[in-house]
Amino acid sequence: MQLFVRAQELHTLEVTGRETVAQIKAHVASLEGIAPEDQVVLLAGTPLEDEATLGQCGVEALSTLEVAGRMLGGKVHGSLARVGKVRGQTLKVAKQEKKKKRTGRAKRRMQYNRRFVNVVPTFGKKKGPNANS
């Protein structure tokens, strides 16, 4: 069966289906010059194990395998290392039931009582509702 291998260039390989992924990596290494240990072979975005055969991995005729090079690194510096830290450390608190707010006539009645009925008369200049003293 034919198999397409997309590395730096697109290659067509003739395989039987009993080859291992390691053999495909060795073949790509001879074509592209990338060391087999530096290659990652992907089928539909999922990496394939070296010892698995193409048949076990579900590779069919005219499938495309992608070969990507391994990236150096591993440490994350700066603010990316702390992404999500605060949210992960914050404790989850259960929502509390709130009393239903009054609307319409009941709300107007409450406002009237607050403004005119329950007012304690004081001497001096009148102060607004947002005054700090």
From Swiss-Prot:
FUBI is cleaved from ribosomal protein S30 by the deubiquitinase USP36 before the assembly of ribosomal protein S30 into pre-40S ribosomal particles. FUBI removal from ribosomal protein S30 is a crucial event for the final maturation of pre-40S particles. PROSITE patterns: UBIQUITIN_1, UBIQUITIN_2. Disulfide bonds: none annotated. InterPro entries: FUBI, Ribosomal_eS30, Ubiquitin-like_dom, Ubiquitin-like_domsf, Ubiquitin_CS, Ubiquitin_dom. GO terms for biological process: translation. One of its GO terms (cellular component) is nucleus. The modification N6-succinyllysine is found at residue 125. Pfam families: Ribosomal_S30 (PF04758), ubiquitin (PF00240). Residues 1-74 form the Ubiquitin-like domain. This is Ubiquitin-like FUBI-ribosomal protein eS30 fusion protein. The gene is FAU.
